Regions:
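A Zn2+-metalloprotease active-site environment signal
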Residues: 6-21, 29, 36-218
């Protein structure tokens, strides 16, 4: 896809090189490690669900933890094409959702996109590279370690700029769910449901985020 003429977003935070917290991403009171991710990948094979969907499902939901202090962002280097690319993708999602919200008498609140390496504090606990990209409803921010894109090519066999952009659009889809109150309603339903039904609701949330990403991509 071509982003040559697309503006860049003003909502990019570059925290790379600032270190970060440790101990895993804590969401909904729990922590997930690589073993959990491995199980998720196996489950995705048998259920026929995209592995990225399962990983995102496991890294979402629950009540946000207390926000940790975040390092001050710094300007994106001029010679960092991938960072400028995701900034343009974010701007493209802003243009799409601002127009859709405006057409429906609502005002869209732009999310922030945080670039980090290794680990970083979030309102949902400590985010780590191993978890892949994720959205934190507690601070309305999307988090990504750009090293994930190499994994996207080699591990998930999804190369190309559209696949890279779609990752951002999917997480922004979770932001839209949050703004519309969908996420809260699903979480309330999960609290009343059994484990199987709660997991099914999480999968539906991920599939809807995929659908919302498709709204941007069409």
């Amino acid at each position: 896809m071509r982003m040559d003429d697309q503006r860049e977003s003003d909502n990019l935070e570059d925290r790379r090189g600032d270190g970060g917290g440790g101990g895993g991403l804590r969401l909904g009171g729990g922590r997930m490690g690589l073993g959990t991710i491995a199980i998720a990948l196996v489950a995705s094979y048998f259920l026929g669900i995209n592995p990225l969907t399962v990983i995102n499902m496991l890294s979402g939901g629950g009540m946000p933890a207390m926000e940790q202090s975040a390092p001050a962002p710094h300007p994106v280097p001029a010679n960092d094409p991938m960072a400028h690319f995701v900034s343009k993708v974010l701007a493209s999602t802003e243009d799409t959702w601002r127009e859709i919200f405006r057409a429906n008498g609502k005002q869209y609140e732009d999310p922030k996109l945080v670039l980090f390496s290794g680990a970083t504090p979030t309102a949902c606990g400590t985010g780590q590279t191993a978890m892949g990209p994720f959205y934190c409803p507690g601070d309305h921010k999307v988090y990504i370690d750009l090293a994930f894109y190499q994994e996207l090519k080699t591990r998930f066999h999804a190369p190309g700029e559209f696949a890279e952009a779609y990752v951002i659009a999917h997480e922004v889809g979770h932001h839209v769910q949050n703004l519309l109150g969908i996420a809260d309603k699903v979480h309330q339903a999960q609290q009343r449901a059994g484990k199987v039904e709660a997991n099914a609701l999480s999968v539906r949330m991920e599939l809807q985020a995929d659908c919302l990403a498709g709204v941007w991509g069409k």
